[in-house]
Structures are given as C-alpha cells and as structure tokens.
Curated annotation (Swiss-Prot):
Spans traversing the lipid bilayer: 318-338
Glycosylation sites: 126, 195
UniProt cross-references to InterPro entries, sorted A to Z: ConA-like_dom_sf, Kinase-like_dom_sf, L-type_Lectin-RKs, Lectin_legB_Mn/Ca_BS, Legume_lectin_dom, Prot_kinase_dom, Protein_kinase_ATP_BS, Ser/Thr_kinase_AS
GO cellular component, one term: plasma membrane
Record-linked PROSITE patterns: LECTIN_LEGUME_BETA, PROTEIN_KINASE_ATP, PROTEIN_KINASE_DOM, PROTEIN_KINASE_ST
GO-annotated molecular function: ATP binding; carbohydrate binding; protein serine kinase activity; protein serine/threonine kinase activity
Protein name: L-type lectin-domain containing receptor kinase VIII.1
Gene3D superfamilies, per database record: 2.60.120.200, Phosphorylase Kinase, domain 1, Transferase(Phosphotransferase) domain 1
Subcellular location: Cell membrane
Amino acid sequence: MSLFLSFFISILLCFFNGATTTQFDFSTLAISNLKLLGDARLSNGIVGLTRDLSVPNSGAGKVLYSNPIRFRQPGTHFPTSFSSFFSFSITNVNPSSIGGGLAFVISPDANSIGIAGGSLGLTGPNGSGSKFVAVEFDTLMDVDFKDINSNHVGFDVNGVVSSVSGDLGTVNIDLKSGNTINSWIEYDGLTRVFNVSVSYSNLKPKVPILSFPLDLDRYVNDFMFVGFSGSTQGSTEIHSIEWWSFSSSFGSSLGSGSGSPPPRANLMNPKANSVKSPPPLASQPSSSAIPISSNTQLKTSSSSSCHSRFCKENPGTIAGVVTAGAFFLALFAGALFWVYSKKFKRVERSDSFASEIIKAPKEFSYKELKAGTKNFNESRIIGHGAFGVVYRGILPETGDIVAVKRCSHSSQDKKNEFLSELSIIGSLRHRNLVRLQGWCHEKGEILLVYDLMPNGSLDKALFESRFTLPWDHRKKILLGVASALAYLHRECENQVIHRDVKSSNIMLDESFNAKLGDFGLARQIEHDKSPEATVAAGTMGYLAPEYLLTGRASEKTDVFSYGAVVLEVVSGRRPIEKDLNVQRHNVGVNPNLVEWVWGLYKEGKVSAAADSRLEGKFDEGEMWRVLVVGLACSHPDPAFRPTMRSVVQMLIGEADVPVVPKSRPTMSFSTSHLLLSLQDTLSDCNTVALNSSRSSSWSVPEHNVIIRSDDDHLV
C-alpha cells in the first residue's frame, strides 16, 4: 500500500510544479478532436492531407489536434518529453507525376497553412510563416532545399532545409510504395535526445533512423499544437494518416514502449485526453537557428530538492495530501471492483475464445449489434461470405454504418475457420485491406464488425451495375489489390496466404479504392518456411493448378488468383463464363478466360480482350501492359509467376513486364506413378475431374477439393 501512496504523492507533487500530462490516441479520428485546414479531409477514419485527383495538381492540407499542448513548464521553460506513433501512406494515382510529401509538425499556429509544392504546407512564400518544428517525409529531391534524395526523412526548424536527414532506402522503406508505414517520433526531456524510427512493421526498430541531441525548449513556446502537414507539387500523390497516438509528460523519460501501437491490432475509439483547458497561447520568442545541442547540463536534482523544501516547509499540506491520497485510492479500488463485477456478470463468454482473439481490435456487445441490424433482419442482408451472412448495421452509440458478418455454421471446425479470419486480419493494417473494427462472442454467436464499403464488391461493380466501371478506376483497383497482396506476402511480420483472392472478395470504398477482404481461408506462415498441405479450398477459375493437386498454398497460388482477377477486370468476363450467350461476347468463345486471352495474345491482338463497354476509352499501351501482367500471373508453372511486389512495380511502370510465351504452356505435375496435365484439372467449370483410368498408387481424395460458388459475396 505504501508503494501506491508514494506513487500517488509523486503525482500530486507534479501538479504542484504545474506539470501537465497529455495523452490521446485514435483508431477512427473523430472530427471533434481535429482541426482540418486546406485540402485536409476525414473519411472512414483516415485523414487525407491532399486531394485524391487523377490529374497532376498542387495543393496543401494540414490536420492538428484541436487543443494546444504544454511543451514547456511555466517559469523554468523545462521541455516536455513526448512520444508520437503514427501510420501513414503515400500513394500516387499517376506514377509518372511525383512530388510532395508530409510532415509531423509542432507549431504555435493553429489557423494557417503554408503554400503547396516543396514546402510541404509548412511555410509561406519565400519561407515566411510561423515558427515550427517538423519531421518531414519527402518524395522529391529539391536542390533548393538541399534534399539528399527523393526518399528521405528530415528534421526541420522554421524552414524546410533539414538540419538532419536520413536515407529511408537504408532501412528498405519506399515512401512512394503506397504501403502503410509506421513512424515513432520521440523526445526525451531529461537526456535532450530526439529520435525518429520508421518501419513497415508494428515493431519499433531497435536503431532509429535519426537520433541527435536537441534543446527543444529553444524552439517551442509554452503551448504548441501538434499534427501533420502535407502537399503536392504538380503530382497526384495522396497523403494519408491512418492512425495516430501522442503522449507527453514532464520530469521523466517516456519508456521505450511509449507511443507504440497496441499489440497486433487496430486501435480502439478515441480516449478522453487529459488536457486541462490550458491558458491562451503565450507569445514567446523562438530562435530561428538550426538546432545544435548546447552543452547545458540538466540539473535533475533541482526538482527533487524543490520537493524536499516543499515537504519541510509545508508538513501540514503533505499530511493532507497523504490522507487524501489514501482516501482516493480506496475509492478508486472500490470503483474498480464494482465495474469489473458488473462486467463479469453481464454475459458468459468463452475463455478459450478470448485468448485466441486477444489481438483483435474491440469487443462489441451482442445487444448493440442485434439492435444495429434490426434483430438481424433479412432486409439488412448485403451479402454472403465464406462462413457467414453479412448485414448492414448502424452502431447505436456512434451512428457509424458498419458491416456485420455473422457465423452461420454451428460446427467447431467452421467456427475455427471463422476465428482464423479474426485472428489474422486483426493483426494487419494496410490501406487496401478491409478494416476490422471489432468482434462479439455471446449467446453462442460469433460476429465480426467491418467498415462498410459503400460501392460494394468488385464483381457487382463489373457485372451488376448499370454503370460501366471506367478504365482509370479499374487500373486503380488492380494496383490496390496488388499492393495489399505484396504487403501480406512479404511486408507483415508473418507471411499471410489469402487463398481466396477473387472479385467478390474485393470491396470498393466511396472513391473506388480496392479493399481486399474475407480472410476465412487465409493462413499465416513464418517467412522462408514451406507451406503445409491442407484441404484445397476456393472458387473454380481462381485456383492455381498446383494447389488443386497438392493442397499446398503458397504466395504463388495467390498470384495465380490475382492473374484471374486482372483478366476479369480488363475483359469484363468471369474466369469461367457459364453463360456463353452473353450479348457482349460471341457464341462459341472459349469459356476459360485465361485460355481465351492467351489465344488473342498468340494472334497479336491481346488488346481485343478489353471490355467492349469501355468503348475504347483507354490507353492501348496501358491495356497491353496490364493484360500481359495478368497472363504472367496466370502461368501454369508457379516458378514463372512474378511476385506481387514485382507486379506492383510493373503496374506503375518501374519494371518491365516479363516475356510471356505466345502459346499457353502445358504444365504437367507428376509423381513416379502419375502424370496429370493442366487440362485435366481445369477442363470442367464446375468440378475437378481426376482421370482415374491412369495407373497410379497416388491420388487426390475428392473431399480434399472444396469448390466455392462465384455467388459468395462478403465484406
């Protein structure tokens, strides 16, 4: 008990010294907590700093936390320690036009924004504007600003000429990749050291990319605003802040874990921050010099001696503090006991289930999801996933519109498949993956809650919409799915094999950005480990032939499925065309899409595979490139298929497309007793036929192939 009392007294003494602690974090950035300037906007919990346009433009946007934060103690000007973790992405709609970047910024000004272009929205014309401290992530090498290259991080004070810079290529980070990038920015007010770390992983690197001494109190006022600024410079870059946390305190170092994301999950709803109605911003002079550490030694004993004098001169006050501390601790313990007893009495839950999903984002109550879906009314059904029905729901507390997937299977095996979706996607974060908001396990039900995608699934946009999906949207969708798969295969902690990439599992947001969903069949594999044989499952037309025969899913099986999606999106035809009398296709056309496109490629007219509904409104060079990439991904031999990272590079023009043979190769899979050709596996659009007439001691059992209908739709 004495330990708690000592801690409580030390906290109260911090208040006597006028110290202020600030802490906040967001999963869905609430508009009430943010101040948006310029082109900045909030959509689906993501802050966009610049405009989402397909034509080159110049603009700037800024987002700030709405309350000023104390950065110096009153009187002493002692600097705060702070830590900020955030996830961001920089995507280029048109890879040929690059220029701009974003910055984490600390500024006394919450009402103005700098100019577009290379200034990142930080400064006005000719470098004018308010004072600031910033960490920039720059995608353009500007000699006027002494940039080291077009892929760097830099530390700026009152201008965009960085005093310290780091090449992100040295840590294998590509700002323009479109992938989610995590950054940790930390300042220790005791040691006066400023650190910047960057990674694709949720784990903070052991060695920061920037680390240098800094007297922060020379460059900040007592109160400052924190946030982000971004700009474009005649480009189509989109700068997005996907998640953000911030914490600060006086008189102590923030631990190494400060500002890090919660374990393998997206974050919860915004927490109430501890900022206490600070006084108006003081107008303090700020040096414009580039930060160079002084040799000023920090007298850490001064605060403790101050505490000692206070204790000697005010014994009555200290006694009162101790008494009050004991009372409030007892009150706090009683409140905790009451809250937890109510929680445990509320509903029975499976302990084993809770341990499996400890990494998931948020737990919803069955009551609120039932109310949000009108008692799971049939009128709210918007699709069917691999293992459940998907409902449109409205969360009663927030009014957010969500998609609720309800497990429709009672067997434990099916529930385990359903749970795999939760355990996998809950640990992932990428702008082209459907975001899992939370879960519920009550009354024998398993429910998953996702962001609702207003434009539905890709297959509905292709085949059921009254409007033709334009070529620019199709290109963006294919690039988004490729980026998501590249992330799953090589850029997250454990490799994730999706195993069910198809158009009905690709969702479209309000801007027709692709979001890959349905991880019910996905499997996690440690990098560089061989996959184990499992039951082959998926949808005919998207399944790689070697996966059908061996049951071993690898990243190349996902590549094959992606190739089928590419050809489907470009041609407007399903991988296996069941209706040969569709008006826009001639009667007698090969029902197998890959074979049909490969035949056109052999004849030198592969662009004829383009969807006739596009009416020729596309660039033929782009069309040819995308179709050849689709054929390369559809190669019967997995060894000749590209990786998804190389596919991304091909689509944006950073790499040449591979040489694809004019005739479709005939790949055979054999053991000492079996030779089974590709045609044997894909000749039937509804079944998988194994030629039993061949003499063999080895076979693929019929129950090892699960074919799913193209009518499966999910979120």
